[in-house]
C-alpha cells in the first residue's frame, strides 16, 4: 500500500476516533489540530474527498464535517493494530468479581452486568447449551424414604433439581446403591448418551424387583431433564444504554428493542461463535438482520479446556469504541470460562 493510501487511512482513523468521542461530524481543521499527521489542512481535505468518493465517509447534512460509513468502520476494525490492553488490576478485579458468583446463574448475571458497565452497551450472554454439556455429577438425596431429590450437575456448572416420588420407601443402604447405579450410568457422558444409558438401565432392571421400580421412576424424571429441557436462554444487561444513543440508530431503535425481546436474532448470531477467544465484529448490515440495521455486534464464545459453552457479546450503535469493546468482550469471556471450568 502506498504512502497516500496509508495517510488516508490515518485520516479515516482520526475521523472514527473523533466521531466516537464527540458524536459530531469531523472537519479537516479539527483533524489537523487534534492529530499529528504532519500534513496541511488542504491535504486532509483532499484525502477526505477520496475517502468519501470510495464510500468510507459521508456528509450527514449541510455540515462541512464527515462521519464514517459502515464500510469505513469495517476498514477501521480490519486494520486495528492494537486492542486497548487492560491493566493487571482491571483483570484481577474482573476475575474476583466473577469468582464471587455462588452458582452458574450468579456468575452469568455478574458477567452480563459487568460487561454492560465496562462497554456502556447492551451485553448478552447465552446460557451454556445443553447439547454440548456432559453430566459431571448426580446427587441423590432422600427427602423422605419414598421421596427423592435428584440433582444433575453438568460440566458447565448448570444445576437441575427434580423430585421423584417412589412407590415404596427405601432405606439408606438402598439409597446408596441407587445413587451408585444411576451415577455409573450418567456421569461423564454427554446428555444425549446419558439419557440413553439411564433408559437402558431401567429397561434392563424392569420386573426384577428390588430397586427396579425406584430406578424406573428416577430414569423417567432424568430423561425428561436431560432431553426435553432444550430451551435456549439469553441474559441481557444494560438495555438502558440504548436510550443514551437513540439518535445513532436513525429511528430503528424500536426494532432493535423488539429483536432483543424476542431473542431469536441474537441467539442466531451467538450460535455462530464456535471458537472461544476469537472475537467477531459485525457492523450494520453484516448482522444479516433487517431489525439490527444501524447496530454493531461484537461477540465471542466462552468455554474451558477447548470446549465451547455458549456465546456472549455486546451490541450497540455502529458509532462504538471498537478497540475498547473488543478487549472487554475478550477478557470477560476468558474469565467466565476460567471460573466455570474450575467449578
From Swiss-Prot:
Protein's gene: hrcA
Family statement drawn from the similarity comment of this UniProt entry: Belongs to the HrcA family.
Species name: Mycolicibacterium vanbaalenii (strain DSM 7251 / JCM 13017 / BCRC 16820 / KCTC 9966 / NRRL B-24157 / PYR-1)
Highest taxon, organism lineage: Bacteria
Claim: Repressor is one of the keywords in the record: yes
Role of this protein: Negative regulator of class I heat shock genes (grpE-dnaK-dnaJ and groELS operons). Prevents heat-shock induction of these operons.
Name of the protein this chain belongs to: Heat-inducible transcription repressor HrcA
Swiss-Prot/TrEMBL GO biological process terms: negative regulation of DNA-templated transcription
Disulfide bonds, paired cysteine numbers: none
GO MF term (any one): DNA binding
InterPro entries listed in its UniProt record: GAF-like_dom_sf (IPR029016), HrcA (IPR002571), HrcA_C (IPR021153), WH-like_DNA-bd_sf (IPR036388), WH_DNA-bd_sf (IPR036390), WHTH_transcript_rep_HrcA_IDD (IPR023120)
Keywords associated with the record: Repressor, Stress response, Transcription, Transcription regulation
